Structures are given as C-alpha cells and as structure tokens.
C-alpha cells in the first residue's frame, strides 16, 4: 500500500524529544533554528504524500499543529533544562528535584523523552492542574492491575451506553446531530463527549498496565492518574474543562497562554485578568488548530461551527465566573445544594453550545465516537425495544 500523510504522525511526534535533546547542546538564543528542519519536514510530508481514503485517519495528521506548538514552547518560550525538574519522593514524604544538568548521559536522554512526551507533567515540577486521584501510595502491582481492569470495564460500559445511544439517535450515523430535535440533539451531544473521553481513558489504562507490569515506564503507581475526572465534578463549565475533561493537550496551550498573560498583558499571577487572558488565548489557539486539522482532512467542509464554539467558550466562562461571584458575595449561595443547579447548567450549556462542533466531527466522520466494537449491547437493546413496540 502506498504511504499517506497519516502514516508519518508517529514520526512527527518523535521530533519533540529529539529536538529537546539537540536543544540541550544549543545556546538558548539559537534554539529556534532547530524548528526550521522540523517545519521543512512537515511541509515535505504534506506535499509529497497524499491523504488516504480514511477521513478519521487523515484527521490525526492535524496533530502536527499541536506538535509544532509544543516544539516552539520548549525551544523558544521556555528553558526546560533549567525550569523543568524530575521529582522523586523521599522517605520523609518530601520531593527531591533532579535538574537536567545533574544527570548522566543516559538519564539526560531519558529526561528529554520523558519531558517531551509527558503531556500532564506527572513526575515533574510543572505538573498540570488538578489531576484525578491516583491509587494510594503502597498499592501493589496486583492491586493496581485489578483496579485498572475495573476502571477499563467501567469506562467501557459508559462508552458503550453513550456510543450506542449516539449511533441509534443518528440512525447508524446517517443523520447529523444538528438534524435532531432539541432534546435528542442535547442527548446525542452529551453522549459524544462521554463516549470519546471513555475511549481515551481505556487506551491510557491499557498502556499503564503494560508499563507497570513490565517495569519499563510509569512504574510509580501512586502517580498513575486517570485521564478524566468524575462527572460529578462538572457543576461548573470551568470545572468540566479543568477537572473532568482530559488534560492531555493542556500543556501546549498553557505555556503560551501564561507567556501572554505575564509578559504581554503583565497581569498579576493568580488574578482574574491573568486567568481570563489565559482562557481566551488558550481557547483561541485550540480552536485554530482544531479547525485547521479538520479543514485539512475534509477541505470541502467549512467547519465554522468549530471556530464559533472555541471562540464563544471563554466568553461563557467569564460570564459564569461573574455570576458565581455575584451569587456567593451578594446572595450568600455557598451551600452544596447549588451544585445540582450547576450540573444542570453545565449539561445544558455544553450540549447547546457544542452541538455544532460535535456535528462538525461526526458528520464527515472525523471523530464519530460510535461503539468501538461491532457488537454494542446498548445499540442492540434499543433496536430490540423499538422492534418490539412496532
């Protein structure tokens, strides 16, 4: 079979640790030069190899935009060899930080690969915030493998229910999400979010089981955090993005957003201005590379709803912050009962606002979030119920 662009995605991701390793031997003011061969290689792949017939596979090539962003962050915006340190727990419960220049040659290579491919900063001093709870310290390998299998089964059940409902509502994918009436449209949109995140968590936990059981990677069980947090934490949109939705691509957006907030806007750290600046910039960047990736995979589609969703979201988050602050300071709403209202708000806001974005992914077949296996108990049960009624 002839090679196509998506076949080079893995190689493109490997450029990050290689460039970080080369950057350790390069003066900081010259590291940007390393981006030139990276850009040239990406252009060569784009012009020399065509897209294949699988639209979903073609969409994965769009991650080249994220890789380019991460490479720019590590080589230009940051000095990882001074700012990033491995963390190692000590016997007294504290953390020992290992700088890059204190390591031997082999450990420096491991450091570069670990840093480049660690999207959430687990085991590093720059860990992204806040991650779902990991197994307790002292958990044995056997107990961890058992917990992981339970997690995988739970996630698959959630995935099958959500994916089966989504497939059934869209009539085997023949109907777009936007073509549905309001209530089924909201349900279908929520099912897409739940189905897609569950698949990510399942794949991640299989990788964790391999790493822990073999002893090759991710061997510190107490740092093997799940990908997605509990849905009960979604009583605000902000908590949905910060705690429940996957954090795998947060790093690439967080670094330039902080640079803009602190160096350009000069907002005080932790202030409302800093938070909103980072929110607006991160969602804008995310929207642009989601749109560009989708446009490359399906050039005939406009994907304007994708851009609209990402540009609208920070405004809604700002409005949410202001309303919560007013309710707490002026109305004294601090009880736990208001979380029920918050869960309803998050469900309605997310499903209504993201319907166009989800339709942009489902209709062309970019990310359908349909059942991972051919046999879906949920889909079979729904079809059987309809046939029995008929």
UniProtKB/Swiss-Prot annotation:
Membrane topology (UniProt): Multi-pass membrane protein
Biotechnology section: Fusaproliferin shows cytotoxicity against pancreatic cancer cell lines and provides a new chemical scaffold that can be further developed to obtain more potent synthetic agents against pancreatic cancer. Fusaproliferin and its analogs show also anti-inflammatory activity and can be hit compounds for the treatment of inflammation-associated diseases.
UniProt EC number: 2.3.1.-
Annotated pathway: Secondary metabolite biosynthesis; terpenoid biosynthesis
Gene Ontology terms, MF aspect: O-acyltransferase activity
Xref: InterPro entries: Wax_synthase (IPR044851), Wax_synthase_dom (IPR032805)
Protein keywords: Acyltransferase, Glycoprotein, Membrane, Transferase, Transmembrane, Transmembrane helix
Top-level taxon: Eukaryota
Coiled coil: none
Principal subcellular localisation of the protein: membrane
Disruption phenotype: Leads to complete loss of fusaproliferin production and accumulates terpestacin.
Cellular component, GO annotation: membrane
Residues that carry a glycan: 58, 242
Compartments reported by the entry: Membrane
An example Gene Ontology biological process: lipid metabolic process
Membrane-spanning segments: 6-26, 32-52, 61-81, 307-327, 343-363
Recorded family membership: Belongs to the wax synthase family.
Function text: Acetyltransferase; part of the gene cluster that mediates the biosynthesis of the mycotoxin fusaproliferin (FUP) that belongs to the class of bicyclic sesterterpenoids. The FUP biosynthetic pathway starts with the enzyme encoded by FUP1 that combines a C-terminal prenyltransferase domain responsible for the synthesis of geranylgeranyl diphosphate with the N-terminal terpene cyclase domain, to yield preterpestacin I.
Protein's name in the database: Acetyltransferase FUP5
């Amino acid at each position: 079979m002839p090679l196509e662009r998506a076949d080079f995605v893995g190689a493109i991701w490997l450029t990050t640790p290689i460039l970080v390793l080369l950057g350790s031997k390069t003066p900081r003011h010259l590291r940007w030069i390393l981006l030139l061969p990276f850009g040239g290689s990406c252009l060569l792949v784009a012009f020399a190899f065509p897209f294949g017939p699988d639209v979903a596979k073609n969409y994965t090539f769009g991650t080249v935009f994220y890789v380019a962003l991460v490479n720019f962050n590590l080589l230009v915006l940051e000095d990882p060899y001074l700012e990033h340190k491995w963390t190692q727990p000590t016997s007294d419960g504290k953390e020992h930080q290992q700088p890059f220049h204190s390591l031997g040659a082999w450990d420096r290579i491991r450091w570069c690969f670990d840093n480049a491919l660690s999207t959430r900063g687990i085991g590093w001093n720059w860990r992204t915030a806040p991650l779902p709870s990991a197994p307790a310290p002292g958990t044995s390998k056997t107990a961890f493998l058992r917990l992981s299998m339970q997690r995988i089964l739970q996630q698959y059940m959630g995935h099958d229910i959500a994916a089966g409902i989504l497939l059934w509502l869209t009539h085997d994918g023949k109907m777009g999400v936007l073509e549905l009436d309001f209530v089924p449209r909201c349900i279908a949109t929520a099912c897409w979010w739940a189905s897609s995140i569950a698949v990510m968590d399942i794949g991640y936990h299989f990788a964790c089981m391999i790493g822990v059981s073999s002893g090759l990677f991710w061997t510190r069980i107490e740092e093997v955090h799940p990908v997605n947090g509990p849905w009960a934490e979604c009583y605000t949109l902000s908590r949905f993005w910060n705690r429940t939705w996957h954090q795998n691509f947060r790093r690439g957006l967080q670094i330039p957003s902080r640079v803009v907030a602190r160096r350009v806007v000069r907002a005080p750290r932790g202030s409302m201005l800093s938070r909103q600046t980072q929110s607006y910039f991160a969602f804008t960047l995310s929207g642009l590379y989601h749109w560009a990736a989708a446009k490359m995979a399906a050039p005939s589609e406009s994907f304007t709803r994708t851009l609209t969703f990402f540009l609208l979201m920070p405004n809604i988050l700002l409005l949410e912050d202001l309303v919560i602050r007013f309710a707490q300071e002026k109305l004294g709403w601090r009880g736990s009962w208001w979380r029920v209202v918050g869960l309803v708000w998050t469900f309605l806001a997310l499903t209504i606002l993201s319907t166009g974005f989800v339709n942009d992914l489902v209709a062309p077949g970019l990310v359908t979030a349909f059942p991972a296996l051919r046999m879906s108990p949920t889909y079979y049960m729904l079809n059987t119920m309809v046939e029995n009624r008929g």
